[in-house]
């Protein structure tokens, strides 16, 4: 009867094993030791043999220093000390779960249920054939007995041992863990080692004499309530009433390494491998970090998750091909954070440049590719304004222990970054904080973020721009997209004050992680992500929707169905702009197109075409002339204006002869250096001369010349059947 302690790899140490044994046996940590030469066994309750992964229960009368030991059979070990020899039995299985011993399952340590299932459920037949074990397709925490006690909701103070026992058994036997309650988590036996580099650098750069290895970074750890493994499956009945809950406080913290992690996810290889897990229909609340995934999450699924009352809803080293359904982030300080972890000194992301040189894959680059979320709803904590210390503390926490901006300085200049870099790598990602934002995806080492998409999103209070993706200048490969989003209370500092003067983010405050930003950069997306459709509700600081316009690389064709007898003119595509109201900038109508001025090369003048009328005003010898007809028609061809003027008065008396002047032209002419007036003029009183039209430079006034010397035409005095006709072109300034 072998009582093995199954402890997967990945951020697991001897200390962690001892803590796990103490937890499942109900002992103090100092009462559990690894079995090794020279061990003083006096006062110990349990010893652990790492070679056979077995736990042995001492009788309490053993003394002396261990000289040797011999496992007689699967149930017995003989330990020899410098005082005596002792026969010890393996930690016995205790079958307790209900009043009928024949139907009980569970163990005293929560790790050997399989033996009991084999011994008991294999012998209980079902009416439909087979045995009871065949019908057991899931595990619950209530199936386990620890320290002769089973979990009773509302009575048991700490559900962590029962939760972990169920998860461990489910992992071993490929069974899902089903939660039917919100289980309290008081203890945090799991250990997570925070990101750090090992001090090494790519050997080729050392050989070249331009880089060298240095001391590794110090080890820092955090505590977690439960741990999921590769292929772990944990599901509840709904996101409201089933899950786990801690007692961490958003208002008072702690906001440092003493904070807690709810769900720690890690595969066998820790940071240097993939992990695949499945969490559905759960509520995770009351932890500094709701869920933390070590390694690259690949082919994992999450659905109907509510993460509430947490500091950071999730931290992920990276992910690839992950699918999420409905993710509801309810009253937290920061949404999910992906990537951005300092895990190597090398300014590179190719496996050749990553330890152990080469790495089996680029896990330590923390890449993010091809994830899809159906619904992503973020509700900021309306009781905590951005001025609350929780925001700055958690921003600093993530930078201090994950992103580590100070490390981005090259080693030669006092930082930890390699002096060399991979050829063609994009710029390092910049840290812009994580709090007051729905989702943050960082690229730490210049590897592009590719196609991390959301179908539908809802934002209810996000002081910063809700979505941020690192964008490498010059590369927009993998442009991620959000299908549609609804916004409410975005870009404001104090939730209750709304979008008012003094409360506008980036305008009325300085973001400590983006101090040069003096206007709100975007309502929805910053960096290499864009939203395709935006609904703006109340109290949103107005800006562009996306800092970088999303790219549609596949091309598009827009088609509209109409009634076969419909002959009306209608819009097939309209582009509008909002500043104070919606204004149509481009309308592609079924019968015409309304467009802005055309530019045929990037540095050329804008082309406009226009047609209209105006009323010319005539002066002769400085006197205004009353006319019975004054018609002006113009056509605009870019910067060239074509004019037709017709003036009539069949009984006009002119008292004083003098120069001819017509004002009121539709456009101001350009300076004389850019062109002259060209055209013809006719009036019956101009005999023996050829009249020349001239628009005075930088005015809207037409004068009439009678020769090329520039002599003004003087209209004679008298009473006339007056008529005047002019057709001419003149030039106006470019782009006016």
From Swiss-Prot:
<comment type="function">
    <text>Functions as a receptor binding protein (RBP) and probably mediates the attachment to the host capsular exopolysaccharides. Displays a depolymerase activity that specifically degrades the KN4-type polysaccharides of Klebsiella pneumoniae capsule.</text>
</comment>
<keyword id="KW-1238">Degradation of host capsule during virus entry</keyword>
<dbReference type="GO" id="GO:0098015">
    <property type="term" value="C:virus tail"/>
</dbReference>
<keyword id="KW-0946">Virion</keyword>
<dbReference type="GO" id="GO:0098671">
    <property type="term" value="P:adhesion receptor-mediated virion attachment to host cell"/>
</dbReference>
<keyword id="KW-1161">Viral attachment to host cell</keyword>
<dbReference type="GO" id="GO:0098994">
    <property type="term" value="P:symbiont entry into host cell via disruption of host cell envelope"/>
</dbReference>
<keyword id="KW-1235">Degradation of host cell envelope components during virus entry</keyword>
<keyword id="KW-1233">Viral attachment to host adhesion receptor</keyword>
<keyword id="KW-1160">Virus entry into host cell</keyword>
<keyword id="KW-0945">Host-virus interaction</keyword>
<keyword id="KW-1227">Viral tail protein</keyword>
<protein>
    <recommendedName>
        <fullName>Depolymerase, capsule KN4-specific</fullName>
    </recommendedName>
</protein>
<dbReference type="GO" id="GO:0098996">
    <property type="term" value="P:symbiont entry into host cell via disruption of host cell glycocalyx"/>
</dbReference>
